[in-house]
Design a protein with these regions (language model features):
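NTP-dependent nucleotidyl-transfer catalytic core
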Residues: 1-171
């Protein structure tokens, strides 16, 4: 059994708000809370992960995987973003009791409908257009300057350190 952790340090709006509030950079805020998290884990006697991979350290990996997904027809570029096409996976809903028609527009409260999606359950792999106009961390990509979506981060980090076949993924 392998255990890994990503600190999800890619600078979404809460990070920027915290950085402004504390008069620090986004990366300083990320490091502060990463250190606090692991200090708490130590106090609780939680085993340290086998791997701690900052999400920002794998931008090249994300771009390679997204490019491969586009080339193989599993992702598409629309409205400035790259989306994963959930209709390409026949068994996408195998782990829940819902049909696609039963699912809400977004997985979380506050997720807005996106007219650029081919399917309501598609998700962004790479943002160049976002509701967070002042995104703190951005990188060059074949699709424009932007940042990765959380789904691609989890997938790439898991594949790099645990292989392509996972028995359990949670978080």
């Amino acid at each position: 059994v392998g255990h890994l952790s990503s600190d999800a340090d890619t600078g979404e709006d809460k990070m920027l708000k915290g950085a402004r509030r504390e008069h620090k950079t986004v990366m300083e805020i990320a490091q502060f809370y990463t250190d606090a998290f692991f200090a708490d884990c130590k106090k609780l006697n939680i085993k340290y992960p086998d791997v701690v991979q900052p999400a920002t350290g794998m931008i090249g990996d994300y771009i390679k995987v997204i490019s491969s997904l586009i080339d193989r027809g599993y992702a598409y570029f629309a409205g400035g973003n790259v989306y994963f096409d959930t209709s390409k996976l026949r068994r996408y809903y195998v782990f829940n009791d819902h049909d696609e028609e039963d699912l809400a527009v977004g997985v979380r409260e506050g997720v807005e409908e996106d007219a650029n999606k081919r399917n309501k359950n598609d998700f962004v792999l790479w943002f160049t257009k976002s509701k967070f106009e002042d995104q703190a961390l951005k990188w060059d990509s074949p699709w424009g300057v932007g940042y990765p979506g959380w789904h691609i981060e989890c997938s790439c980090i898991s594949m790099k350190y645990q292989g392509e076949h996972l028995d359990i993924h949670c978080g």
